[in-house]
Amino acid sequence: MRTLRGPLRQPVRRLGLPQPLVVSVHGGDVRMNPISGTFRLKGHDDPEERKQALLEFLADEKEIYELFMVVDEELKMMCDICNEGGQVLGPFLKPMTHLVHTEYLLAGRTSRDVRDVLRDTMYAATVTGSPVENACRLIRRYESEGRGYYGAALALLGRDPQGRPTADSPIVIRTADVTVDGDLKVTAGATLVRDSDAAYEVAETRAKAGGILSAFGLVPRATTDSDAIAALARDEDVLLALGSRNQR
């Protein structure tokens, strides 16, 4: 395991929820999944009020350009590794237990070694900032202690039935680090841009941590019906609002 601040030496156990994709390579097909922008479900129990709040979120300039920033950074990575071209799909919604994210899917073709692809897609801009290299320098300069596993590079390497190399690498977020002494640490962050509101971003980090904390019984479980949220993600007005983002 290698982290943003180098190798991690403290013995810990990592427990977590399903992780968002950073990059995958299968048969030369490359996928990246830039994610940014967070709609908190808490406080939106009425279906109509929830829909209206989501539509306002999708039209929010700050949320739009926050995702664009991450997409732009990962597109630069894709342009470097995908010598056979690619495409951008989305935006889409990614419903979670306590929140809903906005995301794109980037797809392309490469002939490069999967290990090179992994190296050149470290680290996800949504957990470092942009440009990634400069952001990592600032993290090293201003953060007094390491982030542990949070935002680290994790990968599963293998081969497909035809013997071709494969790789799947997620963002290590929404996890809990548990030490041998039983201490538990959950890390969450938010993407800051010019129009960010400090109080809103703090509430966002609490919502992000809520999923893993509720799994441990440390905070109440989400009360929102997951089927209702999935249906909202397919709502025509919501789909139109998502599509209109690409007209900017």
Q: What does each model-identified segment do?
A:
Residues R5-L8, K51-L54, L138-I139, R159-Q162:
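Short secondary-structure boundary micro-motifs
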